[in-house]
């Protein structure tokens, strides 16, 4: 019998600060607000799910994630427009539902559709963190249950803060690590919704931005 060895929880402290009427960081590109539950209304269930369905959900999530290792932002002479076009026509497109929703943490916000996801998070992120390693640390936690899957790691990404595109802070060229979780809803054969807790305050602290000190001012 397996026993729990560790437990990690990400509380969106920045969203708590936002709801209290303070905003200590740059404006989000996406829409801020409370995350909705799954469109299928079945996020919590106490029934045993079909094992084959769970395996298929996990495989789809992992295959999509592996496709993200294709990095057009590192192509010689790549421009903002070039990378954006490549991401909109990236192999990831095969796995996302046409009506996908991406729910990011406070500081990034929510995005609708692949175009919104690319414009509000993926493109700025990739332009800022061109030097990154998903696999050195990795999303080593992999769980699936029916039409849901999740991956995570503590930490799960190591990268170099190389531009101001993501979150809007001047590049520091510092190496940072990220605490990230990905929760997926698989619907109509594709990934329909993606909830992504990220410890933004922890990332900002590594590049010299203390959000908790800022709210005191």
Predicted regions and their residues:
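C-terminal and inter-domain tail/linker signature
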Residues: 1-217
């Amino acid at each position: 019998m397996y026993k729990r060895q560790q437990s990690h929880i990400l509380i969106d402290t920045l969203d708590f600060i936002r709801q209290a009427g303070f905003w200590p960081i740059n404006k989000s590109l996406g829409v801020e607000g409370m995350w909705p539950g799954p469109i299928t209304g079945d996020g919590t269930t106490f029934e045993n799910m079909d094992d084959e369905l769970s395996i298929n959900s996990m495989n789809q999530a992992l295959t999509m994630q592996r496709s993200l290792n294709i990095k057009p932002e590192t192509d010689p002479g790549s421009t903002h427009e070039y990378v954006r076009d490549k991401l909109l026509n990236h192999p990831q497109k095969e796995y996302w539902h046409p009506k996908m929703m991406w729910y990011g943490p406070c500081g990034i916000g929510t995005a609708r559709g692949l175009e919104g996801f690319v414009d509000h998070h993926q493109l700025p992120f990739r332009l800022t963190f061109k030097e990154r390693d998903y696999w050195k640390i990795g999303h080593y936690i992999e769980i699936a249950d029916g039409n849901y899957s999740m991956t995570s790691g503590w930490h799960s990404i190591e990268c170099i803060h190389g531009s101001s595109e993501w979150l809007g802070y001047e590049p520091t060229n510092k190496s940072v690590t990220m605490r990230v979780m990905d929760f997926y809803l698989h619907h109509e054969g594709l990934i329909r919704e993606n909830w992504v807790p990220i410890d933004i305050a922890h990332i900002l602290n590594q590049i010299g931005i203390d959000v908790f000190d800022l709210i005191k001012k």
